[in-house]
């Protein structure tokens, strides 16, 4: 079995942790992830979600521009500190590389605001895909930086 790869990106945002958490968890993903970053596509739509995104155990299908999909399941909600999820059933360009992802958003008090950290623990398909992961990791960090900037604009604006 191959070891997972942990990717993480953070940004300080000048809002209280409670507000950052409360407004990030239910935020529509196509609003947050609306831009391409190199070959990483934006989110086009969400399907199969029932009600507000707020409870562990809820699932939804993420549809990417370009045709890929993935299934997201909310695994933990610890307001206002963090929420976690898994991504499975990946189709499209990431499918040959990634088996599943354990994701987390973490909200830590920092000064008068919040340090928001987005973490992905990647479980690759096989050891054969390992050489491609450093390239994907570099791209993901850029995508995460861009997404955290978008989140900051949403929370502050």
Q: What label would you give each PLM region?
A:
Residues 1-52:
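Hydrophobic ligand-binding cavity/cleft-lining segments
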Residues 3, 66-68, 112:
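Short acidic/polar mixed-charge low-complexity motifs
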Residues 9-11, 70-76, 101-109:
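Hydrophobic/aromatic beta-strand elements that line small-molecule binding cavities or substrate pockets
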């Amino acid at each position: 079995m191959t070891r997972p790869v942990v990717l993480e990106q953070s940004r300080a945002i000048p809002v209280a942790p409670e507000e950052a958490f409360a407004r990030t968890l239910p935020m529509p993903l196509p609003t947050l992830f609306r831009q391409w970053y190199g070959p990483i596509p934006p989110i086009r739509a969400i399907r199969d979600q029932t009600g507000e995104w707020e409870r562990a155990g809820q699932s939804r299908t993420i549809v990417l521009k370009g045709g890929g999909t993935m299934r997201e399941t909310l695994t933990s909600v610890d307001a206002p500190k963090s929420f976690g999820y898994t991504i499975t059933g990946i189709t499209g360009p990431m499918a040959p590389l990634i088996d599943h992802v354990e994701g987390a958003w973490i909200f830590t008090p920092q000064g008068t605001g919040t340090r928001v950290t987005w973490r992905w623990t990647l479980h690759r398909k096989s050891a054969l895909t390992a050489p491609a992961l450093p390239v994907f990791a570099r791209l993901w960090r850029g995508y995460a930086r861009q997404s955290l900037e978008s989140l900051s604009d949403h929370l502050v604006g």
